[in-house]
């Protein structure tokens, strides 16, 4: 059953307030609730949860290991561990570069691939889109198109075999294991049927996809390795192991915590029937992505949180871009909707309960 929501548009702050609640199923024996697909983003619907999909019965398929990825991740983390031993002897500019690079790259994931392109929770003008596509390339976590396709599948088929990093398969699988094995057949089957027409029509996203390997070589490998070496005389060993291996391993693991820890540990104040949790530690590590129970309850909210800037650097960044006129039409769930949802499906942990 669908419902068209009245929208309250504020031209002053360029924010769309969602005025009616959104319902979804309850799990673990609780009553299932009808889904209402709000017509607030006409260009995208395939990130809304589909309660009709259920896993097929029977034994899971045999795991097929991707040894290339296993070897790469093993070598990366060995290099990162060695990089930790080099941190005390590296120049201060080197680790400052690593922090700066990861914040920018992180925004390419959180403000770019996630909130802009996966969920269309706000709109960005060309200069901001160019910045975010470059920042996303710096992160080296798949191109925007592939990242968004996997993420939409994660929301639509959450915690089923069609979810690429299904948390029901355990912490390790949802953290990194899903990258070390072939995708479950259900992920492939459902993923190819997702509507990705909005991204296929965006020239910048498809340009990145076409030249992704070349761009990653330049922006992810060459720049962070050679800049410390050439500009302030860092040793090549320190540049490679600290500014590249260690930096990248930290960025990856902080991102992966959203898939693992934020689906297994924390409170569920907005929807007790789903696995996604509120995890402040994950929010600190991931620039604000740890308010996961809220995000899976209201995936169309640009802040992915009820509290906007609280432990949420990405929302602060988007709001700054809006103040500069580079971001607009930010979707925000109204307080009345949030409180109604807390009362109806929350676990009682919210301060208003």
From Swiss-Prot:
Family: Belongs to the fatty acid desaturase type 1 family.
Signal sequence region: none
Main enzyme class: oxidoreductase
Cytoplasmic side: 1-66, 113-211, 258-353
Protein keywords: Endoplasmic reticulum, Fatty acid biosynthesis, Fatty acid metabolism, Iron, Lipid biosynthesis, Lipid metabolism, Membrane, Metal-binding, Microsome, Oxidoreductase, Transmembrane, Transmembrane helix
Gene source species: Mus musculus (Mouse)
CDD domains assigned to the protein according to its UniProt record, in alphabetical order: Delta9-FADS-like
GO biological process: cellular response to nutrient; fatty acid biosynthetic process; monounsaturated fatty acid biosynthetic process
Primary gene name: Scd4
Assigned EC number: 1.14.19.1
Membrane-side (Lumenal) residue stretches: 88-91, 232-235
Binding site for Fe cation 2: 154, 263, 292, 296
Disulfide pairings: none
Requisite cofactors: Fe(2+)
UniProt-listed Pfam families: FA_desaturase
Function statement: Stearoyl-CoA desaturase that utilizes O(2) and electrons from reduced cytochrome b5 to introduce the first double bond into saturated fatty acyl-CoA substrates. Catalyzes the insertion of a cis double bond at the delta-9 position into fatty acyl-CoA substrates including palmitoyl-CoA and stearoyl-CoA. Required for the biosynthesis of membrane phospholipids, cholesterol esters and triglycerides.
Protein name: Stearoyl-CoA desaturase 4
Description of its domains: The histidine box domains are involved in binding the catalytic metal ions.
InterPro entries: Acyl-CoA_DS (IPR015876), FA_desaturase_dom (IPR005804), FADS-1_CS (IPR001522)
Tissue expression notes: Detected in heart, but not in brain, liver, skin or adipose tissue.
Biased composition (Polar residues): 8-18
Binding site for Fe cation 1: 114, 119, 151, 155, 295
Record keyword Cell cycle present: no
């Amino acid at each position: 059953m669908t419902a068209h929501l009245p929208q309250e548009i504020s031209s002053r702050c360029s924010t769309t307030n969602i005025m009616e609640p959104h319902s979804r199923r309850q799990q673990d024996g609780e009553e299932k609730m009808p889904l209402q697909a709000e017509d607030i983003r006409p260009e995208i619907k395939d990130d809304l949860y589909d309660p009709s999909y259920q896993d097929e019965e029977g034994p899971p398929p045999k795991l097929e290991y991707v040894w290339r990825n296993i070897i790469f991740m093993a070598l990366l983390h060995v290099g990162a561990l060695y990089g930790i031993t080099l941190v005390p002897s590296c120049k201060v500019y080197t680790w400052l570069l690593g922090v700066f690079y990861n914040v920018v790259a992180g925004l390419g994931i959180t403000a770019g691939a996630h909130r802009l392109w996966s969920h269309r929770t706000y709109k960005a003008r060309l200069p901001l889109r160019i910045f975010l596509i470059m920042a996303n390339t710096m992160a080296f976590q798949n191109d925007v198109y592939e990242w968004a396709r996997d993420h939409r599948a994660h929301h639509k088929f959450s915690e089923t075999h069609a979810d690429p990093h299904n948390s029901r398969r355990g912490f390790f699988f949802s953290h990194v294991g899903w990258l070390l094995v072939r995708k479950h057949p259900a992920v492939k089957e459902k993923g190819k049927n997702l509507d990705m027409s909005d991204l296929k029509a965006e020239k910048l996203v498809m340009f990145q996809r076409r030249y992704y390997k070349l761009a990653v070589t330049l922006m992810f490998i060459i720049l962070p390795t050679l800049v410390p070496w050439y500009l302030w005389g860092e040793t090549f060993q320190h540049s490679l192991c600290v500014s590249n291996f260690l930096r990248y391993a930290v960025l990856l693991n902080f991102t992966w915590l959203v898939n693992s820890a934020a689906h297994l540990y924390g409170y569920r104040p907005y929807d007790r029937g789903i696995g996604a949790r509120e995890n402040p530690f994950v929010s600190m590590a991931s620039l604000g992505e740890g308010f996961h129970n809220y995000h899976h309850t209201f995936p169309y909210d640009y802040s992915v949180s009820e509290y906007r800037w609280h432990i949420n650097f990405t929302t602060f960044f988007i709001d700054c871009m809006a103040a500069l006129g580079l971001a607009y039409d930010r979707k925000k769930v109204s307080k009345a909707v949030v409180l109604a949802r807390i009362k109806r499906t929350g676990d009682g942990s919210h301060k208003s309960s």
